[in-house]
Amino acid sequence: MKRHMISLLVLLTLPSVVDSSHLNKQRELIVTSESTRESIELAKYLKDNGVVKYSAYWCPNCLNQSELFGKQAYRELNVVECARDGINSQTQLCIDKKIKGFPTWEINGKLILGVLSLKELSKLTGFNN
């Protein structure tokens, strides 16, 4: 019985160890989904209008948010890395902005915490495709 419990514990923790070690080596979000024309246009609009996404490379919700855009559109976004050990980290800016969690969007000076659908972002920013 004890052997089965140990085996179960190892199996349950192994995926998280593998995932976190992969992320820690990269120290940046790796977006794999493909963008649509609409998501690229929205990302460009957000960037042109000063919308900022505060993020951390190790944050699963940040990755989920980025995957909604796809890799091509993600490159267009204004993203601030808040993790101290992240690539191009801007931790002090995140502290100054009082970022409490990730992802956080800054839209027209207002901070909005959480994953937002592309439709929600469009509505909040006045983007009309």
Predicted regions and their residues:
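Structural micro-motif
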Residues: I95-I107
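Non-catalytic, surface beta->alpha helical segment in thiol-disulfide oxidoreductase systems
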Residues: E106-N129
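Solvent-exposed loop/turn segments at secondary-structure junctions
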Residues: Y57-C62, A83-D85, K100-G101, L111-L113
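Structural recognition of the beta-strand scaffold that forms the well-ordered cores
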Residues: V52-S55, N78-V80, T104-E106, L111
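N-terminal targeting signals for export/organelle localization
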Residues: M1-E28
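Local sequence-structure signature of Cys/Sec-based thiol-disulfide redox active-site neighborhoods
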Residues: S35-E76
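Structural microenvironment flanking redox-active thiols in thiol-disulfide oxidoreductases
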Residues: R84-L93
